[in-house]
UniProtKB/Swiss-Prot annotation:
It comes from the Bacteria. Belongs to the NusB family. The keyword Metal-binding does not apply. Involved in transcription antitermination. Required for transcription of ribosomal RNA (rRNA) genes. Binds specifically to the boxA antiterminator sequence of the ribosomal RNA (rrn) operons. It holds the Pfam family NusB. The lineage of its organism: Bacteria, Bacillati, Bacillota, Bacilli, Bacillales. GO terms for cellular component: cytosol. One of its GO terms (biological process) is DNA-templated transcription termination. InterPro entries: NusB-like_sf (IPR035926), NusB_fam (IPR011605), NusB_RsmB_TIM44 (IPR006027). This is Transcription antitermination protein NusB. GO terms for molecular function: RNA binding. Keywords: RNA-binding, Transcription, Transcription antitermination, Transcription regulation.
Length: 129
């Protein structure tokens, strides 16, 4: 599975878990839709879930005039996924994580999602440097 596909499937899983409060394995199976699972995909989903508190704190510090629970569900899931990569996965360049998040926002979010996600992640990037 390509990393972009793994990110898309991870986003779908995290979105379902957040919205429907279903078990991670069930959400992952649903997102995979019969496809073979992938180590990177699993690392993303479980990594976000295991580190959600730290990730959410980092995101909250960089939200201007927004509360995390008021964000569009898909934007919140994209931010969590990308912030996880930026904070915890040293083998992936931060700019790659950001670009992938922006592409996910264009694909799954609304007209303003990509710009919003880019702004928040840029601030997180500055914090990490």
């Amino acid at each position: 599975m390509k990393r972009r596909t793994a990110r898309e499937k991870a986003l779908q899983s995290l979105f379902q878990i957040d919205v429907s409060d279903i078990e991670p394995n069930e959400a992952m199976q649903h997102a995979l839709d019969g496809q073979e699972s992938d180590a990177f995909f699993e690392q993303l989903v479980y990594g976000v879930l295991e580190n959600k508190e730290k990730i959410d704190e980092m995101i909250k510090r960089h939200l201007v005039n927004w509360k995390l629970d008021r964000l569009a569900n898909v934007d919140r899931a994209i931010l969590r996924l990308s912030a996880y990569e930026m904070i915890f996965l040293d083998d992936i360049p931060v700019n790659v994580s950001m670009n992938e998040a922006i592409e996910l926002a264009k694909q799954f979010g609304d007209d303003k999602s990509a710009k919003f996600v880019n702004g928040v992640l840029s601030n997180i990037k500055s914090d990490l440097e």
